[in-house]
């Protein structure tokens, strides 16, 4: 009887301590710490690679879509060239008798009213008046009237009717 009990006990004891390998134990791949370290390393490498790719793409887009400083400087007018090419307009002394286009007695650039005896400049083409300092600063970056946006440069093209002799 002891033999029968020993045989019966032996399969139970071996079942209590099973040998677990990757084919017989389904939890084996998740229990090995070296596999977890390798998986974490691969995941970390993938995240870093994705970050590098994203930053490279951002830099490329910023480089190609953003104009360079050299092209921006080409579009800005040169103040010295603008001063030399700006037509000279006479400086007048403001008085209430002075008639300006639009009948406004204020500078459209600084929005302050003209005072008696103040120096102003009147543009020849549109007859709008401005403070001397205001219009010089305006014309150093632009070539149009601040009020009506008319070009300050005169057009030299004459109409054909001006050549007809009667």
Swiss-Prot record:
<dbReference type="Pfam" id="PF13639">
    <property type="entry name" value="zf-RING_2"/>
</dbReference>
<keyword id="KW-0479">Metal-binding</keyword>
<feature type="transmembrane region" description="Helical">
    <location>
        <begin position="41"/>
        <end position="61"/>
    </location>
</feature>
<dbReference type="InterPro" id="IPR001841">
    <property type="entry name" value="Znf_RING"/>
</dbReference>
<dbReference type="GO" id="GO:0008270">
    <property type="term" value="F:zinc ion binding"/>
</dbReference>
<keyword id="KW-0863">Zinc-finger</keyword>
<comment type="similarity">
    <text>Belongs to the RING-type zinc finger family. ATL subfamily.</text>
</comment>
<dbReference type="GO" id="GO:0016020">
    <property type="term" value="C:membrane"/>
</dbReference>
<keyword id="KW-0862">Zinc</keyword>
<feature type="zinc finger region" description="RING-type; atypical">
    <location>
        <begin position="107"/>
        <end position="149"/>
    </location>
</feature>
<keyword id="KW-0808">Transferase</keyword>
<keyword id="KW-1133">Transmembrane helix</keyword>
<dbReference type="InterPro" id="IPR044602">
    <property type="entry name" value="ATL10/ATL72-79-like"/>
</dbReference>
<keyword id="KW-0732">Signal</keyword>
<dbReference type="GO" id="GO:0016740">
    <property type="term" value="F:transferase activity"/>
</dbReference>
<feature type="signal peptide">
    <location>
        <begin position="1"/>
        <end position="16"/>
    </location>
</feature>
<feature type="region of interest" description="Disordered">
    <location>
        <begin position="71"/>
        <end position="90"/>
    </location>
</feature>
<dbReference type="GO" id="GO:0016567">
    <property type="term" value="P:protein ubiquitination"/>
</dbReference>
<keyword id="KW-0472">Membrane</keyword>
<keyword id="KW-0833">Ubl conjugation pathway</keyword>
<protein>
    <recommendedName>
        <fullName>RING-H2 finger protein ATL79</fullName>
        <ecNumber>2.3.2.27</ecNumber>
    </recommendedName>
</protein>
<feature type="compositionally biased region" description="Low complexity">
    <location>
        <begin position="81"/>
        <end position="90"/>
    </location>
</feature>
<keyword id="KW-0812">Transmembrane</keyword>
<dbReference type="InterPro" id="IPR013083">
    <property type="entry name" value="Znf_RING/FYVE/PHD"/>
</dbReference>
<comment type="pathway">
    <text>Protein modification; protein ubiquitination.</text>
</comment>
